[in-house]
């Protein structure tokens, strides 16, 4: 179904069965598959390919040569009906690739809302990207990676399978992330190691002075106290009872399977 207000360039191909919302703009030489749903106001600039079971929300801007919903690169994939979901108001720049999920990983690759995926960024199968994240040029997420809200991943950075990038994290460019990065942390290097708290980013997002002090104290317990990881977790949990900002650390520890960067 194609809304009558949608614009489809004469050179674009929109296959029967696709659902195209109001005021969608599909530019020259785009290809939209039969199981694709594109929400109101989304723009496909030109030469964009969207296929598979892919649902795109409203008011996204998708630039030339982006590929969304293509078959993933997991060698176990055997053509199962897996999906991609993308939220609203994302900017997906040139040559970005977002692959469909796998049955083993839950069958869904998901990108939230208000994100910026810069040129040539790659989101592999079964990844979850939250809201208001930035993946800089050539940033690469391997399969099953989780990127939490407000995280920034620098250019040319690669993130290992199953890693977690916590909320408000900043990962420097040209890094290799092989373990989980706790929330609020600055990480850099190959393999990435912690370099303090992302204080400037947190200030811009309105964190209170008291909250910033509590986050710094949690960071010091984890990385500067000389305590074991289990000891640090216990003291951070006590700190979280008084300071809600620190709960992000305890929730991170519950999810972490690869262990925090050290």
Curated annotation (Swiss-Prot):
Record field: catalytic activity: a (3R)-hydroxyacyl-[ACP] + UDP-N-acetyl-alpha-D-glucosamine = a UDP-3-O-[(3R)-3-hydroxyacyl]-N-acetyl-alpha-D-glucosamine + holo-[ACP]
Family indicated by similarity: Belongs to the transferase hexapeptide repeat family. LpxA subfamily.
Domain of life: Bacteria
Pathway info: Glycolipid biosynthesis; lipid IV(A) biosynthesis; lipid IV(A) from (3R)-3-hydroxytetradecanoyl-[acyl-carrier-protein] and UDP-N-acetyl-alpha-D-glucosamine: step 1/6
EC number(s) per entry: 2.3.1.129
SUPFAM superfamilies xref list: Trimeric LpxA-like enzymes
EC supergroup of this enzyme: transferase
Keyword terms, alphabetized: Acyltransferase, Cytoplasm, Lipid A biosynthesis, Lipid biosynthesis, Lipid metabolism, Repeat, Transferase
Gene3D superfamilies assigned to the protein according to its UniProt record, in alphabetical order: Hexapeptide repeat proteins (2.160.10.10), Udp N-acetylglucosamine O-acyltransferase, C-terminal domain (1.20.1180.10)
GO biological process: lipid A biosynthetic process
Protein location: Cytoplasm
Gene name in the database record: lpxA
Task performed by this protein: Involved in the biosynthesis of lipid A, a phosphorylated glycolipid that anchors the lipopolysaccharide to the outer membrane of the cell.
One Pfam family of this chain: Hexapep
GO cellular component: cytoplasm; membrane
NCBIfam families registered for this protein in UniProt: lipid_A_lpxA, PRK05289.1
CDD domains xref list: LbH_UDP-GlcNAc_AT
Protein name in the entry: Acyl-[acyl-carrier-protein]--UDP-N-acetylglucosamine O-acyltransferase
Organism: Salmonella schwarzengrund (strain CVM19633)
Assembly mode: Homotrimer.
One example GO MF annotation: acyl-[acyl-carrier-protein]-UDP-N-acetylglucosamine O-acyltransferase activity
């Amino acid at each position: 179904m194609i809304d009558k207000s949608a614009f489809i360039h004469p050179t674009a191909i929109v296959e029967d069965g696709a659902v195209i919302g109001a005021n969608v703009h599909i530019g020259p030489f785009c290809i939209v598959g039969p199981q694709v749903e594109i929400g109101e106001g989304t723009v496909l600039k030109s030469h964009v390919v969207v296929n598979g079971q892919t649902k795109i929300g409203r008011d996204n801007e998708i630039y030339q040569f982006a590929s969304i919903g293509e078959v993933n690169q997991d060698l176990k994939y055997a053509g199962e009906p897996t999906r991609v979901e993308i939220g609203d108001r994302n900017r997906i720049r040139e040559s970005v690739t977002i692959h469909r999920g796998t049955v083993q990983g839950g069958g869904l690759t998901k990108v939230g809302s208000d994100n910026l995926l810069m040129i040539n960024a790659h989101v592999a199968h079964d990844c979850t990207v939250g809201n208001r994240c930035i993946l800089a040029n050539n940033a690469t997420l391997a399969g099953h990676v989780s990127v939490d809200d407000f995280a920034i991943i620098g250019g040319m950075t690669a993130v290992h399978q199953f890693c977690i990038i916590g909320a408000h994290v900043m990962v420097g460019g040209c890094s290799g992330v092989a373990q989980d990065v706790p929330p609020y942390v600055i990480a850099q290097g190959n393999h990435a190691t912690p370099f303090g708290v992302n204080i400037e980013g947190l200030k811009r997002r309105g964190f209170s002075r008291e909250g910033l002090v509590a986050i710094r104290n949690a960071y010091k317990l984890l990385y500067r106290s000389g305590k074991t990881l289990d000891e640090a977790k216990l003291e951070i949990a006590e700190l979280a009872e008084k300071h809600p900002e620190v709960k992000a650390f305890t929730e991170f520890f519950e999810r972490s399977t690869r262990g925090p960067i050290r």
